[in-house]
Structures are given as structure tokens and as C-alpha cells.
Amino acid sequence: MKQTVYIASPESQQIHVWNLNHDGTLTLTQVVDVPGQVQPMVVSPDKRYLYVGVRPEFRVLAYRIAPDDGALTFAAESALPGSPTHISTDHQGRFVFVGSYNAGSVSVTRLEDGLPVEVVDVVEGLDGCHSANITPDNRTLWVPALKQDRICLFTVSDDGYLAAQDPAEVTTVEGAGPRHMVFHPNEQYAYCVNELNSSVDVWELKDPHGNIECVQTLDMMPADFSDTRWAADIHITPDGRHLYACDRTASLITVFSVSEDGSVLTKEGYQSTETQPRGFNVDHSGKYLIAAGQKSHHIAVYEIHGEQGLLTEKGRYAVGQGPMWVVVNAH
């Protein structure tokens, strides 16, 4: 398995393309100049395209991915109704979902043969919308509205239209600020990192039409931490054994182990990382974690090891200015 790492740096308007070697080292293969401040990125389900959101002219760009080395070639673009904060797709590669924090909305862009064509639906009134996350069964879109302490739930029609589910939302504790999410591989649990109080909620997905409840909330931060909490990103290993979340103020990654059924998290430790880690990701083998320092302008690679999933730094690399997003593609 070959793996390629893509790093989005909006301040220098670049995507750095790296080969992830089997020993955890990175080899730079391409630097792409992007026509705008590139932030969120996601790979299409068939691994043929990289979709990126850019500003200040709000668009989604599609880059064709070379199957041999992961190199990028521009393919298409489509306008967006708001500034892109987060980008994702459904599992069939039919739609791109874009959350917009500033617009307080989530939009759906239709894909045709993998290329973005047009916006088919927009839902507004989602103050501080920070991500859009489709469940593994491709039936429910979870959309955190950070400023409202709620996660809105939508069904997605065959034409890409969003309809409020029943229940239409789940709520966090006041002041939590739900931000990013991941799902357990067993499809029974979701994990949401809360930006404003730096906590992680475990949501049990008993039934896509109801009976959804928060079964655990864990504080990410060390007991002696007294500064402003500012959590950012969350990812789980492919085997579902280890979960990671980062805080930008403390510049640390919190390490959790996950119970076999996915219902219980145990905090195992902390890893100091690059300054102001806005984004990170885990590779497809579950062996390496790559974190981006928005203020250090570097990325760091960590090896994941042991039953606890603790991290050991393997190396760090200069990238563009203000790196914010990390995507890993296997090909």
C-alpha cells in the first residue's frame, strides 16, 4: 500500500504533497499553488479526486489524483454559497457537503463523474456550523452547530436534499461548542470534539431514527491546565482502538484508548506537538499520525505504538504558511 499526505496551507495558498514511506518518513513530491486560501480537503470515496474548499472566492476545487504517486492535477471547480470551513462526501461519491462557520450553513454540491457541478441544497440557521459528517450507513448527516451547542441530524435524499430527521438534533452541555466528529468502525458510536470546553462526547447510535444519547464525556486537558480551551480536531485509528484529539492553546494531542465495543474512552496521556495544531490525521495503516502546526509552519509525524496508542515523534518537516488541514490517501 502506497500512501500520500496532503497538507493545506492557506496563508501561502499551497498544497504540499508528500509520500508517506513505510518507515514513517516523508518525501516531498509536489507543491501545488492554489488559486485562493485553501483550507478543508477530502479525498473522494473512489480515491480519484481531492476536493478542497477555498476562499475568499468561495469555491470547491477538484484535483485529479495520479494513481501511481498521488500527484494532483486541477480538474474542475464549482461555486459555494458560503466560506468553506469543512468538506466531506457521502460514501457513494454523489455529493460534497460543505459546512460554513461564517455563513452558519451546510450546503450540498452534486457530483457528476466525480466532478463538482452545482449546489443543490443549502440549510441555514446553523450558527457556527463547523463540519458535516455522514454516518457509515450513508443515511444521516450529523452537522455540529458550535455556537448553538447542538448537532443537527439530516437525511439525504437521492437528489441531495436535506430533511430534518426525527429527532432533528441532539444537544451538548451549555458552552461545549461541538466542532468535528468521527465514527467508530463498528458503526455504533460517534465521537465529537467540543472546541470551547475541550472535551470529547461519545454518542451511541442505537437507531438512525431515534434513541441517540451521549453515553460519556471526557475532559481532554491535564488537570492543571488553566488557560483558554481551544480544541480543534479528532481522529480514530482504522481498527477503532485509539482516538486522538488536539487543543490549539496547549499545543497538545490527547491520547485515548477505546473499549472493544466503542462505548468507553480512557485517557491514556498527552503528546506535545507543533504550535497551534489546527488539523491532524491518522494514516490508513494505523501506524502513524501527522499533525500540522498552524503557527510553527511545520508538520510532525508520530508513530503510534503499544496498547495505549501513545505517540513517538519520527520527524518534522517545513510546509507552507499556516498549515491547517491534513489528508492521507491510500492507493
Swiss-Prot record:
Keywords for the protein's UniProt record, in alphabetical order: Acetylation, Carbohydrate metabolism, Glucose metabolism, Hydrolase
E.C. number(s) listed in UniProt: 3.1.1.31
A molecular function GO annotation: 6-phosphogluconolactonase activity
Pathway per the UniProt entry: Carbohydrate degradation; pentose phosphate pathway; D-ribulose 5-phosphate from D-glucose 6-phosphate (oxidative stage): step 2/3
Top enzyme category: hydrolase
Protein name as it appears in the record: 6-phosphogluconolactonase
Modified residues (N6-acetyllysine): 287
A GO CC term attached to the entry: cytosol
Catalysed reactions listed for this entry: 6-phospho-D-glucono-1,5-lactone + H2O = 6-phospho-D-gluconate + H(+)
InterPro entries reported for this sequence: 6-phosphogluconolactonase_YbhE (IPR022528), Cycloisomerase_2 (IPR050282), Lactonase_7-beta_prop (IPR019405), N2O_reductase_N (IPR011045), WD40/YVTN_repeat-like_dom_sf (IPR015943)
Protein family per UniProt: Belongs to the cycloisomerase 2 family.
Any Pfam family matching the protein: Lactonase
Job of this protein: Catalyzes the hydrolysis of 6-phosphogluconolactone to 6-phosphogluconate.
Gene3D superfamilies: YVTN repeat-like/Quinoprotein amine dehydrogenase
Lineage, top ranks: Bacteria, Pseudomonadati, Pseudomonadota, Gammaproteobacteria, Enterobacterales
Domain of life: Bacteria
Entry's Gene Ontology BP terms: glucose metabolic process; pentose-phosphate shunt, oxidative branch
